[in-house]
Regions:
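Active-site loop/helix belt of alpha/beta enzymes
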Residues: 1-104, 189
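Charged (often Lys/Glu-rich) extended helix/loop segments that serve as interaction or gating elements
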Residues: 67, 78-222
């Protein structure tokens, strides 16, 4: 950026972390200060991006505090952290139902949820979502390939094992599904979305926040 016209530039942003502890942030800041320290003295704020696993057990928050205070003191600027998935880590479940089971080279189960519609981040990252009470293939007695109910050939959630055979109508609970997934869903071919609900563990009540209808799909199409 040497010689660049930076008039009107109020702040700088870097986004280099993903599920990292504050030691990775410290290494990044050392590089930022070495290469862009002169710019930090000319701006009003620094956005350190996301990817900070602040809520994870063992995260070094004391180091994070020290790093933030150090930047503020050295340059007199505001410091921002993007919340990222840490604010929802380990929260939220996606409750699905087994629609049918069959056998074609291996045991299969069709669910009323779709990885392309309801769990797109699992495809894009990609990562394998955890199912409560399930294991990796052949870890438990009965292994199934789980698929969604859309016409997409690649709508395959993955292979999981269960202690007992799956049955039509059985509920399967996908864990840790609150981050990214909800904001990236699609209504591919009019597939129905699950409702958003809040569970109160003290009163043991479930409050429905939003239910989706065909009208939501129609209106998104213009």
């Amino acid at each position: 950026l040497t010689g660049a016209d930076l008039e009107g530039l109020d702040g700088l942003n870097f986004h280099t972390l993903c599920e990292q502890d504050s030691d990775a942030l410290e290494a990044t800041l050392e590089g930022v200060e070495a290469k862009f320290g002169d710019l930090l003295r000319r701006v009003k704020w620094l956005n350190m991006g996301g990817g900070h696993h602040i809520t994870r057990a063992g995260y070094d928050t004391e180091r994070l505090i020290r790093l933030i205070k150090g930047i503020k003191e050295r340059y007199g600027i505001a410091v921002y952290l993007e919340p990222g998935e840490a604010i929802a880590l380990g929260t939220g479940v996606l409750v699905s139902t087994v629609l049918d089971t069959l056998h074609n080279a291996m045991d299969l189960a069709i669910l009323d949820v779709s990885i392309t519609c309801h769990m797109p981040d699992c495809l894009e990252m990609p990562y394998r979502p955890d199912i409560r009470g399930a294991g990796h293939p052949r870890e438990l007695a009965h292994t199934y390939r789980l698929g969604g109910g859309t016409c997409l050939a690649g709508d395959i959630i993955g292979d999981y094992s269960f202690p007992e055979p799956l049955a039509t109508g059985q509920r399967l609970i996908f864990e840790d599904m609150a981050h990214y997934t909800m904001v990236k869903t699609s209504m591919f071919n009019g597939v129905k979305h699950p409702a958003f609900c809040l569970w109160d563990p003290e009163s043991k009540t479930l409050k429905t926040i939003r239910q989706f209808t065909y009208g939501d799909f129609r209106d998104r199409m213009g």
